[in-house]
Regions:
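Conserved small/polar residues in nucleotide/adenosyl-binding loops
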Residues: 212-214
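Alpha-helical scaffold segments
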Residues: 2-50, 54-109, 115-116, 132
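Extended alpha-helical scaffolding regions
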Residues: 103-201
Length: 214
């Protein structure tokens, strides 16, 4: 999908103008989605964090829908970029939108093994690659080569601050038993419908269309 977007957007006469709008801090709400996304792809996570509050919720959501998937699979590696961008974002409303999103929940399920934890009868992994939530009721275990632990932990802490301990625990507790494959399938179908509303065609739909014309 991204390759197609790049090709289409390069033909858009206002691409350089959009990049100027991004750099100048002007409003972006009326800019067509495809060229806006392409113009923003050159930004590092720090600059994207400053851009996020200037986007509409719909624009932010479409950016994630486009960027986080390889065909019908979530791409956890690409998620690291957005994790850093939202972690650095200074607008609480935007950050809270992200940590309450289904994408963030699915990301946590993809990266972490989540276990209940009993402080009176603690059961720790036999390695150091884990952390406890601030209420010490959940243990998040991760692979030794995962590098975005501090950012993920900080956003989980934000979730607790927003929802309160009881509701945050109840929300994250579902990670213990939820099926990743089922969650991913549901999210893929929902993101496909959202993108279709903006005129985007996903990989498999594009493949079907190309086969029809062979």
């Amino acid at each position: 999908m991204i390759k197609n977007l790049l090709a289409e957007a390069q033909a858009y006469n206002g691409l350089e103008a959009i990049q100027s709008l991004i750099e100048d801090g002007q409003t972006l709400s009326a800019i067509p989605m495809q060229p806006l996304y392409v113009a923003s792809r050159a930004l590092d996570a720090s600059n994207m964090s400053a851009l996020l509050p200037r986007l509409t919720p719909e624009q932010r959501n479409v950016f994630l829908d486009i960027d986080l998937w390889k065909k019908d699979d979530l791409d956890p590696d690409r998620f690291d970029y957005w994790l850093e961008a939202y972690h650095q974002c200074e607008v609480d409303e935007v950050k809270q939108e992200f940590i309450n999103s289904s994408e963030f929940y699915l990301f946590l399920k993809a990266i972490f093994n989540v276990w209940t934890f009993d402080v009176e009868d603690p059961n720790y992994p036999n390695h150091d690659y884990y952390f406890l939530t601030d209420d010490s009721l959940l243990l998040f275990e991760y692979s030794e080569d995962y590098e975005q632990v501090l950012e993920a932990k900080a956003l989980i802490r934000e979730l607790y601050a927003q929802k309160g301990v009881e509701h945050a625990y109840a929300y994250l507790f579902k990670l213990v038993s939820d099926s990743y494959s089922s969650l991913e399938e549901i999210e893929y179908k929902e993101k496909k419908e959202r993108l279709r509303d903006y005129g985007f065609v996903d990989y498999y739909e594009a493949l079907e269309l190309s086969l029809i014309h062979i």
